[in-house]
Design a protein with these regions (language model features):
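The feature captures the beta-strand-to-loop junction immediately N-terminal to the Walker
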Residues: 43-45
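Helix-to-loop junction immediately C-terminal to a conserved catalytic motif
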Residues: 58
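Conserved ABC transporter NBD signature motif
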Residues: 66-78
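Conserved ABC ATPase "signature" region
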Residues: 104, 119-137
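Conserved ABC ATPase signature
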Residues: 141-145, 149
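Catalytic Walker B motif of ABC-type/P-loop ATPase nucleotide-binding domains
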Residues: 166-170
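ABC ATPase nucleotide-binding domains
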Residues: 231-261
Length: 261
């Protein structure tokens, strides 16, 4: 269930883009190209515009300046090729919905509204459950799953739309260390299967072990197509001390405000 053909054009191409809300500019002069098979991690402080960037890519927020193409099209048209896992997904623990039914929601779309699910839909759902290693939980109520398992269900739901690009906003924000590692391993597998991934994360100590390249976004984007989290990137993006792990030992990356004391 991997994409059948590679795109001649980038999946996402952003040039000199600025965007925001009312009179507040949140993103400024953003340039980013997402190529097929990329696995890009975006780090940065809260309020730095990471979620806003996702809204622009999904066509939910128009840019105030610059251009963006998704699959060579306007985001409103190209987003049908995108699977999205939001930062927070509300669910009613008293509602007896099964895991399989949650994943099946990913098959909804303009072509499926008011139509019964097909045998093809059911097959895709089962494949997605297998991809996130939850086949045995298909008939279980969602409320019985752990936080990490629920997050894998939401990833499966996004995969059910058979996307070429997967956007994930803080996929490990509410899970423990073990579940975090499992989710990143899962995303690594999905990327190897041909799905391009762009994710937001605060797990600086984990993210560089799995993604192919890293960028730091704090209103402006510091991205050079490299995997290493550099001191310059942290200083430019955070403007504060950040603890990283190097060779198994914690060390502090000093940012500008300490240097200027």
């Amino acid at each position: 269930m991997t994409p059948t053909a590679a795109h001649a054009t980038p999946l996402v191409e952003i040039r000199d883009l600025s965007a925001g809300y009312n009179n507040e500019m949140v993103l400024k002069d953003i340039n980013l190209t997402v190529e097929p098979d990329d696995f890009i991690g975006l780090i940065g402080p809260n309020g730095g515009g990471k979620t806003t960037l996702f809204k622009v890519i999904l066509g939910l927020l128009p840019p105030q300046k610059g251009t963006i193409k998704v699959m060579g099209m306007a985001p409103e048209k190209g987003r049908r090729h995108i699977g999205y896992v939001p930062q927070f997904t509300y669910y009613d623990s008293d509602f007896p919905i099964r895991v399989r039914d949650v994943v099946r929601m990913g098959r909804l779309g303009p072509k499926h509204l008011f139509k019964p699910y097909t045998a093809e839909d059911d097959q895709v759902v089962e494949e997605c459950l297998e991809r996130v290693h939850l086949t045995e939980k298909g008939n279980a109520p969602l409320r019985e799953l752990s936080g990490g398992q629920r997050q894998r269900v939401y990833i499966a739901r996004a995969l059910a739309s058979e996307p070429e690009l997967l956007l994930l906003d803080e996929p490990t924000i509410s899970v423990d260390v073990e579940a975090t590692a499992q989710i990143y391993e899962l995303l690594h597998e999905i990327n190897l299967q041909g799905v391009t991934i762009l994710l937001i994360s605060h797990d600086l100590n984990v993210i560089s072990s799995y993604v192919k390249t890293i960028g730091c976004l704090n209103r402006t984007l510091h991205y050079h197509g490299e995997k290493e989290i550099t001191a310059d990137m942290i200083q430019a993006g955070y403007n504060c001390p950040v603890e990283l792990i190097a060779h198994g030992l914690p060390h502090r990356v000093l940012a500008r405000h300490e240097e200027q004391r």
